């Protein structure tokens, strides 16, 4: 607990909660706070100018970060025939159909992402109550139901993140690790913000990217001045 209280004191001393920080200063602070004995993630919260109660204003999608997430991702693919061979060649960890479904039903889910070809949805559809609550159900909106399973596997392995606003209109996701170079974190953040802009609902009014905050796994949030970003 001493380490945590020491970190908490440091954060209170260093972070002005009323201030928007230059991106470089924000990243420097995050790195200073990342003193946990594990490799901390850098997380982002983006407050969107949307009415999350309206389905036509919800924002959901996926994008590949230029510098990846720093996390090794295990990918399971539901497909068959030639697509199965392509998925394996692209680096899929587990490939199957009914046999893979049986593993899932038995609670054997040693994977982080599930991809399915359209013809496999008859099998995957039966697993909704298991995969859905875990955020693993394939969905065409985020590119995990696709005829191009090999491309989807490569995206997942190369640092694709999925995003979806919560009930308060906030996007929560990860943009890398605390030991990334500052320029890598900035590039990843700008790439995410660009993807969010492209996904802006037609009916959203006023300022769209209202607030951008960065934090490490065990750290406090630091608000970023968007004017210091290339994609602002």
Swiss-Prot record:
Keywords: Repressor, Ribonucleoprotein, Ribosomal protein, RNA-binding, rRNA-binding, Translation regulation, tRNA-binding. GO terms for biological process: regulation of translation; translation. Signal peptide: none annotated. Disulfide bonds: none annotated. One of its GO terms (cellular component) is cytosolic large ribosomal subunit. InterPro entries: Ribosom_uL1_bac-type (IPR005878), Ribosomal_uL1 (IPR002143), Ribosomal_uL1-like (IPR023674), Ribosomal_uL1/biogenesis (IPR028364), Ribosomal_uL1_3-a/b-sand (IPR016095), Ribosomal_uL1_CS (IPR023673). Part of the 50S ribosomal subunit. PANTHER family: 54S RIBOSOMAL PROTEIN L1, MITOCHONDRIAL, LARGE RIBOSOMAL SUBUNIT PROTEIN UL1M. Binds directly to 23S rRNA. The L1 stalk is quite mobile in the ribosome, and is involved in E site tRNA release. Protein L1 is also a translational repressor protein, it controls the translation of the L11 operon by binding to its mRNA. This is Large ribosomal subunit protein uL1. It comes from Colwellia psychrerythraea (strain 34H / ATCC BAA-681). The lineage of its organism: Bacteria, Pseudomonadati, Pseudomonadota, Gammaproteobacteria, Alteromonadales.
């Amino acid at each position: 607990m001493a380490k945590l209280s020491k970190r908490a004191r440091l954060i209170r001393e260093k972070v002005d909660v009323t201030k928007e920080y230059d991106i470089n200063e924000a990243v420097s602070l995050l790195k200073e706070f990342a003193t946990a004995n594990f490799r901390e993630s850098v997380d982002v919260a983006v407050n969107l100018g949307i009415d999350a109660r309206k389905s036509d204003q919800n924002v959901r999608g996926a994008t590949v970060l230029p510098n990846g997430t720093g996390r090794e991702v295990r990918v399971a693919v539901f497909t068959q025939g030639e697509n199965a061979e392509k998925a394996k060649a692209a680096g899929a960890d587990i490939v199957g159909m009914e046999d893979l479904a049986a593993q899932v039903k038995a609670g054997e889910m040693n994977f982080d992402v599930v991809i399915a070809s359209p013809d496999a949805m008859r099998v995957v559809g039966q697993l909704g109550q298991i995969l859905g609550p875990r955020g693993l159900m394939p969905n065409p909106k985020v590119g995990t139901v696709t005829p191009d399973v090999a491309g989807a596997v490569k995206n997942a392995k190369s640092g694709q993140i999925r995003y979806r606003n919560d009930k308060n209109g906030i996007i929560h996701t990860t943009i890398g690790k605390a030991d990334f170079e500052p320029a890598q974190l900035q590039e990843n953040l700008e790439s995410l913000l660009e993807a969010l802009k492209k996904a802006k609902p037609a009916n959203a009014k006023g300022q769209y990217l209202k607030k951008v905050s960065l934090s490490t796994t065990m750290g406090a949030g630091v608000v970023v001045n968007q004017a210091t970003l290339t994609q602002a």
